[in-house]
Amino acid sequence: MLYLYNTLTSRKEAFIPLEEPFVKMYTCGVTPYDKAHVGHLRTYLVTDLLRRILRFLGYYDIAVTNFTDIDDKIIKKSQELNKDWKEIVEENIKYVFDVLKELKVLPFYVYPRVTYHIDDIANAVKSLLDRGYAYKGKYSIYFDVDKYPYYGQLSGIKSKKEWEQEKHLLEDKKNPYDFALWKFKQPGEPYWNTIVGEGRPGWHIECSVMSSKYLGERFDIHLGGSDLIFPHHENEIAQSETLYNVHPWVRYWVHIGMVQINGEKMSKSLGNIIEAKEFIKKYKPEFVRFFLLSTHYRKPLDISEENIEQAQTIYKKLTDAYNTAKSIVENEVSYRFDKDVRIILDYYREMIKAFLDDMNTPTAIASLNKIVSIFNQNPEYPIAYLTLRAFEDFNRIMNVWFEKPIDLDIINEIIEIRNMLRREKQYELADKIRDILQKKGIKIKDYKDKTVWYADI
C-alpha cells in the first residue's frame, strides 16, 4: 500500500482513492511569463514519479496540469519587453512542452489554460457572489474569508494573515485578508467581457475551476511547490469548498520542497536561476531525472557541484551494473542456485517498500546500491537475473535510463570476431575493435572465460 504525507493533516496516511482503480490528480503548473527553470522541473518530475508508482500498483491515473496564461507577471513582462503578452505565453508554453518531452514525462490527460476557461471562471465567481461568499469592490470581486469557517486548515495560519498589497486594494476590501476572485478592467491590460463584468480572473479561482472541471467536484491528490501552501492553496480550498459545497475538496495535498543553488534560495534577485533547457543540455536528460529525484521530494534540493558529482558517481555505478546484468542475462542461461539470491530479494522488497513510503527515493536508491554491491562481487546468471529485475522495476518508477535501439545480432557478431582475434593473440586488432565500439557507446568487459558487452545508456 502507498503512503503519502498529507499537508492537510500533517501526517503520513495510507492512500485510498475516491473511485478505485482511478486516481484523479492535479498539479499546479507554470505561469509562462518566462522560461521554465529547474524548480518547475522538480515539480513535474515528482508528479511523474507519483504517477509511475500508482501505475506500478495497478491504478489508472487521470492527471491534469495547468498553464496560468494570464497573470500580473505576464502583463508586467509584456510591458517591460514591449511585446504582445500572447507571444510571450506561447513561446514559454512551447518551452515547457519541449522540456517535458526531453525528460520523457508522462503526458497529462489535459493541460487547461486560463484563457480557454474564462466563462467557466466567471460563472464560478457569480455563484459565489449570489450565495453571499463574495462581494464587489471598486477594483475587484473578493472572496469573503470570514464566511468560510475552516480557513487556515492547510497552512496552519489561523490568524487570517494578510500578504503585501497596495494601499488602495486594502481600502477596497472588507478585510485585508480577503482575496480577489475577479479583477475589473484596468487601462492597458487584457480583459474579457463576462457575466460578472469586464476584467480577468484572480489567481486562485483559476485552479479551483480548471481542476474540478476535468476531475470533478472532489478529487484525490493536489500537488504543487511548498511555496504555494499559503496563500494559493489555502485560498483554493476556501473558494472550492464553498463553491462546490464539499469538505474536503481534495483528500491528499502533496507539497514539493524548494530548489536551492549552493545553499541559497533560487531567485531572480540573486541572479542564480537555472533554466530548464540549460540544465538538461549540461547533464543528459536521464541524469537530470535521477538527480532531481534523488533527494526526498519534501526536502529542499540543493544544486551544487559537489552534490552533482556525488550523484554522477552513484548514477554511473548503477548504470554500469544495469548494463552488465542485462548483457549477462541476454547471453547466458543457468539453473544454478546461489546463496545471495535471498539477500537480493530482501533488498528488492526494501526498495519497493521505500517507493511506497511517501516516495522515499533516497532509500530506494540505497537499496538498489546494496543489490549492485552483491552483483559486482558475483556477476553470474542467477544474481544477474534478479539484479536486472530490480533495475527494471526501479526504472519503471524512476525512468532514469531511456532505451536506445541496438542491433543485437550485429554487435554479437563483432564481439565474436574480437574474441576470435583474442584467442589468436592478435591483441592490437582486438583492442582497436574495442575502442571503435566504445566510441559508438558499446562498452566491453572481458572476464576469464567470456566477454560481456552493453550499451552505455
UniProtKB/Swiss-Prot annotation:
Q: Where in the cell is it found?
A: Cytoplasm
Question: Where ATP is bound, by residue?
Answer: 268
UniProt GO cellular component terms = cytoplasm
Residue ranges annotated as motif 'KMSKS' region:
265-269
Alphabetically list the UniProt keywords. Aminoacyl-tRNA synthetase, ATP-binding, Cytoplasm, Ligase, Metal-binding, Nucleotide-binding, Protein biosynthesis, Zinc
* Entry cofactors: Zn(2+)
- Keyword Repeat annotated: no
Short sequence motif 'HIGH' region: positions: 30-40
Q: One Pfam family, short name please?
A: tRNA-synt_1e
What is an example of a GO molecular function annotated in this UniProt entry?
ATP binding
The yes or no answer to whether the keyword Ribosomal protein is present is: no
Give the stretches traversing the membrane: none
In short, the EC number is 6.1.1.16
Q: What highest taxon heads this organism's lineage?
A: Archaea
Per UniProt, where does Zn(2+) bind?
Answer: 28, 207, 232, 236
Q: Which HAMAP family match?
A: Cys_tRNA_synth
Q: What NCBIfam families has UniProt attached to this entry?
A: cysS
Q: What is this protein called?
A: Cysteine--tRNA ligase
Organism of origin is Nanoarchaeum equitans (strain Kin4-M)
The gene designation is: cysS
